[in-house]
């Protein structure tokens, strides 16, 4: 008979989607952002295959943790349920690997319609590094505004801006830390973004063809030219 510790260690790790949905839940109730996130993931408002990312879960966690909200904020690895260290040998991201992982996440329904935030960006990086051995640092998108295209050729997930349903004033304390509310805070153009799969990105390097200046010296443009274009778009050059 195994000990309680061994049973805890053998507990199945949550999937990427669950980890993303657990990020930054608020103190109570379900916000309009969470409802919209569910409707984006499951057309028709169905809850099929998804436990609601309701803030009630965070309220329960707070009660069990001595009333401390976001108690796992101090240990982000524990919050997202990934290993502290990679379970497989590390390897760099490649075009083929990016395409394969993009389709893998698409087939598992892990990213489609999920609100983007800097925190969720980090969770995705950490998940792929610890579960697949893919060294982080490759996941970057064009500056915007509008659709943000992946700058790594082969990654088939772009960020698409959506219009958010306004939250009633008397609910302003509900789930203010949910990515539906905070996504625009992270974004320099104050747009709320969601991940969207686009298989055509495997054939068309949109980020490079439309915004070569964002690639700096790799663009093949004279330094003065690409820096001037960045400044004209309000993008820092240093």
Swiss-Prot record:
Record has Lipoprotein as a keyword: yes
Query: How would you describe this protein's topology in the membrane?
Result: Lipid-anchor
Q: Does the keyword NAD apply?
A: no
Query: Might you report a single GO cellular component term?
Result: membrane
GO molecular function terms noted in the UniProt entry: GTP binding
Pfam families per the UniProt record, alphabetical: F-protein
Residues with a covalently attached lipid (N-myristoyl glycine):
2
From the UniProt entry, list the residue stretches annotated as the region Acidic.
70-77
Instruction: Quote the record's miscellaneous comment.
Output: This isolate is from a Gambian case of 'neuro-AIDS'.
Q: What is this protein called?
A: Protein Nef
Q: Which gene encodes it?
A: nef
């Amino acid at each position: 008979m195994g000990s309680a510790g061994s049973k805890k260690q053998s507990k199945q790790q949550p999937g990427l989607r669950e980890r993303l949905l657990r990020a930054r839940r608020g103190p109570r109730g379900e916000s309009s952002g969470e409802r919209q996130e569910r409707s984006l993931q499951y057309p028709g408002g169905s809850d099929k295959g998804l436990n609601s990312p309701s803030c009630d879960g965070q309220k329960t966690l707070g009660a069990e943790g001595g009333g401390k909200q976001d108690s796992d904020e101090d240990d982000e690895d524990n919050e997202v349920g990934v290993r502290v260290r990679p379970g497989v040998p590390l390897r760099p991201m490649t075009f083929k690997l990016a395409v394969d992982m993009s389709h893998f996440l698409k087939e598992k329904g892990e990213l489609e319609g999920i609100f983007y935030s800097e925190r969720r960006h980090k969770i995705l990086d950490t998940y792929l590094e610890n579960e697949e051995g893919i060294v982080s640092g490759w996941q970057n998108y064009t500056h915007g505004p509008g659709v943000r295209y992946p700058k790594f050729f082969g990654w088939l997930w772009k960020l698409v801006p959506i219009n958010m349903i306004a939250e009633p004033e008397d609910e302003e304390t509900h789930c203010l830390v949910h990515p539906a509310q905070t996504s625009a805070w992270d974004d320099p153009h104050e747009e709320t973004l969601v991940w969207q799969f686009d298989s055509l990105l495997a054939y068309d390097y949109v980020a490079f063809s439309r915004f070569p200046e964002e690639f700096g010296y790799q663009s093949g443009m004279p330094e003065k030219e690409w820096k001037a274009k960045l400044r004209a778009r309000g993008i820092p050059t240093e």
